[in-house]
Amino acid sequence: MDELEELLGESPAIHTVREKLCQLLKHPPAGRRLPAVLLQGETGTGKGLVARLVHRMGPRKDGPFVAINCPAIPETLLEAELFGFERGAFTDARHAKPGLLQAAHRGTLFLDEVGLLPEAAQAKLLTAIEERVVRRLGSTRSEAVDVCFISATNTDLQAALRARRFRDDLYHRLAVITLYMPALRERGRDVLLLAQRFLARACADYGLPPKTLGEQAQARLLAHRWPGNWRCA
């Protein structure tokens, strides 16, 4: 699976991630859904990258990939974004609009930071998963949806379950397969491989001759704790 080479690294932690992805994607059923996947780990550990890899390598690769950052949308608008709305459902609803679940029909819906999903939206999402239907705001009609779900969280969902901030039944629907994305500080010398890749990319982008990391630079990279991990466009 050559595409998994995007998950650069040789540490045991990243090997475990690749092995689990291989098991999940080795024989994907054509046209069918993969089991729901929950990606856990700190911010900046590559959960979005893995979500896109699973979509591209899975049986829904020819369908849409629709991503939503759950806390980035105001709670008052989230249900309309996810489930859609009919004309006149609220003051500014001048035209009917399908929601993101319908936009992801026969493809993949990526729910980023799903642990921060409001309780009301959790209940409607559970219905969509279990019954494979959605009902737009202002509508009395349910419409079929066929979606593969991938979710991600950097919060402790077990604590949220104990505190009753997250529905237990929804958790089990979303976490059929769980995958932990390790932080950089858990990946040892992988940081050097990543740094060298980004350095090579920067040299190419700016028309500079290839460069390598010196011993002092390597030592400082390895000694750093990498709070927030690493993001690179």
Which residues are covered by each model-predicted region?
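Conserved RecA-like P-loop NTPase ATPase core
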Residues: 17, 45, 68, 82, ...
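Conserved post-Walker A coupling segment in P-loop NTPases
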Residues: 6, 20-92, 103-118, 183-188
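Nucleotide-binding/hydrolysis machinery
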Residues: 3-15, 19-23, 58-63, 138-148, ...
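Short coil/loop residues immediately preceding or within conserved phosphate-binding loops
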Residues: 34, 96, 221
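Interdomain coupling helix/linker and adjacent catalytic-core signature
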Residues: 16, 50-53, 97, 194-195
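Short gly/ser/thr-rich secondary-structure transition/capping motifs
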Residues: 88-95, 131-136, 159
